């Protein structure tokens, strides 16, 4: 008996399309947010000046002997903002063939993600630029190295006081965290710079219930990023105080949608942000070098 199947009725079948998926980027900002951030107001210059006063020295005195005065000379660092942007262009005919409102929202999300990644990659060069280094290329990251960074910053020529030590942050790659996690939460064997005592049950439950750092190490939170500067299989992570660097946001994200060229019958969608960044105090940060080869066990 003749039968009709889906193989015969092809022109009446509706095409089924799900919601578009977005290509993900590591667009969180643990690096940028770790530095001192200044945001300009309307009417301000695109160059930010950050002056600094020197310290003075107290001396013992002898009765009846005049003490000598000191000359105060200030210093300054300046950061000039430059534009960073991303743009895409669509024909109006193409937009008419799709759900254009949803498409434009997705494009806005993708462009915002791209700007965040660019910020992170830029400020990662500040971490790579610290003059003092903990860790070693080709070797796994250790808790001892983080502890060394904390100690060096506390004893720096311009030392961080106890309150400032509480503002430190460390940023490492997922591979570096893999090595650190095995030291922070040991199974009972192997060398570790962390105490080998078993963590309380509630701490273990909270720690192992989610991926990544869940707290801090002696007051220093550990963040993960894949936007750190790399050199082969090695990565330039870091531990630093916010005042080690300055991020100046002259103009926040400005998004526009406009006719690119009427004769092209197209629409341009763009996003621009204006910022600058620079090192403020090299002694307030430590570059953390370590092997970041993807682990297999």
List where the protein language model places each region:
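Short, solvent-exposed loop/turn segments at the edges of secondary structure
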Residues: 81-85, 165, 264
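Sequence/fold signature of self-assembling virion shell proteins
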Residues: 2-18, 23-25, 30-33, 53, ...
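Extended, low-charge hydrophobic alpha-helical regions
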Residues: 78-98
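Extended, solvent-exposed, turn-rich assembly/linker loops in the middle of proteins
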Residues: 128-207
């Amino acid at each position: 008996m003749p039968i009709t199947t889906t193989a015969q009725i092809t022109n009446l079948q509706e095409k089924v399309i799900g919601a578009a998926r977005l290509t993900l980027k590591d667009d969180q900002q643990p690096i940028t947010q770790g530095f001192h951030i200044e945001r300009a107001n309307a009417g301000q210059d695109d160059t930010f000046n950050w002056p600094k006063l020197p310290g003075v020295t107290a001396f013992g005195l002898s009765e009846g002997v005049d003490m000598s005065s000191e000359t105060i000379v200030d210093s300054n660092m300046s950061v000039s903002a430059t534009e960073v942007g991303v743009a895409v262009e669509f024909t109006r005919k193409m937009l008419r063939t799709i759900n254009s409102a949803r498409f434009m929202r997705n494009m806005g999300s993708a462009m915002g993600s791209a700007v965040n990644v660019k910020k992170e990659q830029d400020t990662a060069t500040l971490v790579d630029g610290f003059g003092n280094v903990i860790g070693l290329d080709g070797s796994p990251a250790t808790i001892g190295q983080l502890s060394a960074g904390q100690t060096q910053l506390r004893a720096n020529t311009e030392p961080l006081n106890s309150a400032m030590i509480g503002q430190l942050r460390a940023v490492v790659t997922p591979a570096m965290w893999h090595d650190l996690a095995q030291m922070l939460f040991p199974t009972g064997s192997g060398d570790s710079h962390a105490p080998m005592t078993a963590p309380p049950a509630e701490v273990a439950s909270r720690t192992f219930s989610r991926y990544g750092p869940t707290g801090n190490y002696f007051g220093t939170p550990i963040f993960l990023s894949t936007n750190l500067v790399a050199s082969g299989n090695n990565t330039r992570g870091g531990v630093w105080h916010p005042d080690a660097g300055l991020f100046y946001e002259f103009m926040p994200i400005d998004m526009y949608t406009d006719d690119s060229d009427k004769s092209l019958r197209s629409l341009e969608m763009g996003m621009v942000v204006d910022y600058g960044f620079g090192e403020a105090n090299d002694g307030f940060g430590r570059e953390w070098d370590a092997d970041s080869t993807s682990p297999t066990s």
